[in-house]
Design a protein with these regions (language model features):
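Active-site proximal beta-strand in glycosyltransferases
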Residues: 83-85, 96-129, 159, 178
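N-terminal subdomain of nucleotide-sugar transferases
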Residues: 1-44, 79
Length: 182
């Protein structure tokens, strides 16, 4: 069985990226992503000949997230694979053209849901006109939630990494899911 794993970016390697690398190794799967740090991945003992970039994207937010979203939204691998595992929040739009699929959820997009107020108040800068950036952020969040829920309709099965994430998926996205601990 040919399996592809989608992940937002593989240039900063953390827990989610490590899980994806292990999944790819154990399932003999390919990884599709945007930015890749092959040196970091090889230093961790993983091969990189099965990791493919669908295009470089900016390194700073929110341009990084937006670019990753649209790269995956337009990705159509046709019948090249028998199954697709989507293992990134901004890569979830890859479900639109790639089926059958499963979304392995590390978390719904936190800046849209559970951390929205914190980010708005503590991270979004208040420069130029008072609170203008906060209003722009609010419009962006509204638009992103709309697209996120549209794309979610193309996800066929949801598996979460924890009971906590399962609760967030139910609360914010209204979908049931299973749990497979990494």
């Amino acid at each position: 069985m040919r399996i592809a794993i989608f992940h937002n970016y593989m240039d900063n390697i953390g827990g989610a990226e490590l899980v994806d690398l292990i999944l790819a190794k154990e399932l003999n799967a390919d990884i599709y992503t945007t930015n890749i740090s092959r040196k970091k991945i090889e230093k961790m003992g993983f091969k990189t000949d099965n990791i493919f970039s669908i295009g470089k994207i900016p390194v700073n937010a929110p341009a990084k997230q937006e670019a990753a979203y649209w790269k995956f939204k337009n990705l159509n691998l046709g019948k090249k694979y028998d199954f697709y595992i989507i293992a990134g929040d901004w890569a979830m739009s890859g479900a639109v053209h790639n089926k059958p699929n499963l979304w392995y959820v590390y978390s719904p997009i936190r800046e849209l849901y559970d951390l929205n107020k914190y980010i708005r108040e503590n991270i979004v800068p208040s420069v130029y006109l008072k609170n203008l950036n906060k209003y722009i952020f609010d419009v962006w969040v509204f638009y992103r939630k709309f697209l996120n829920k549209l794309d979610l309709k193309h996800v066929q099965k949801i598996v979460c990494i924890s009971e906590n994430v399962k609760g967030r998926v139910k609360k914010y996205l209204g979908r049931d899911s299973e749990i497979i601990y990494p």
